[in-house]
Amino acid sequence: MRSTILLFCLLGSTRSLPQLKPALGLPPTKLAPDQGTLPNQQQSNQVFPSLSLIPLTQMLTLGPDLHLLNPAAGMTPGTQTHPLTLGGLNVQQQLHPHVLPIFVTQLGAQGTILSSEELPQIFTSLIIHSLFPGGILPTSQAGANPDVQDGSLPAGGAGVNPATQGTPAGRLPTPSGTDDDFAVTTPAGIQRSTHAIEEATTESANGIQ
């Protein structure tokens, strides 16, 4: 009987006491509206402590590399940020536009990935649009000579040889039979074909007479 009375007394005294947290030993405090997400982040960090150490950005950053490859274009690498939710965490993930990676693989009969010896030669690539804006020449200027771009050429003179620009239209320089006109030096021991043809014609003429 005495034990039951003591139990009721103890229960009444514990109910009158404020509710305390068993782990912290502090009374609960009211949180502001801005502080409502802090316990969720703390709980997620306690459950997954390694989430804060995982880099959530892409390994391949093409923006600074393109700026180094083509500094004259003056392009600024544009990035897009997309929210990524992991439990209670809100992380901004950076994604570069116009880059679509393609991963090619081949599965076996039972859904297992084949080894490199059994796989054929498969290429992986990146589809990149507008790699160098302003750096691609139009088709009309692709084969233009840089020495001729400053001056204006007449019609039909794009592929004119500079040695024959001074000659009249329709007349091309013809060989006169002498080596001095073209300043051609024939190596010793090699006879020009024109001299051989002339000797053959003179011998045939002498044989006819």
Swiss-Prot record:
Family matches, as InterPro entries: Amelotin
GO cellular component: basement membrane; cell-cell junction; endoplasmic reticulum lumen; extracellular matrix; extracellular region
Modification after translation: Phosphorylated by FAM20C in vitro. O-glycosylated.
Localization: Secreted
Disulfide bonds: none
Superkingdom: Eukaryota
GO-annotated biological processes: biomineral tissue development; cell adhesion; odontogenesis of dentin-containing tooth; positive regulation of biomineral tissue development; positive regulation of enamel mineralization
Region of interest (Disordered), residue spans: 142-209
Position of the signal peptide: 1-16
PANTHER family attached to this UniProt entry: AMELOTIN
Disease annotated for this entry: Amelogenesis imperfecta 3B: An autosomal dominant form of amelogenesis imperfecta, a defect of enamel formation. AI3B is characterized by hypomineralized enamel that has reduced tickness and exhibits structural defects.
Function: Is a promoter of calcium phosphate mineralization, playing a critical role in the formation of the compact, mineralized, aprismatic enamel surface layer during the maturation stage of amelogenesis.
Record's protein name: Amelotin
Organism: Homo sapiens (Human)
Origin organism lineage: Eukaryota, Metazoa, Chordata, Craniata, Vertebrata
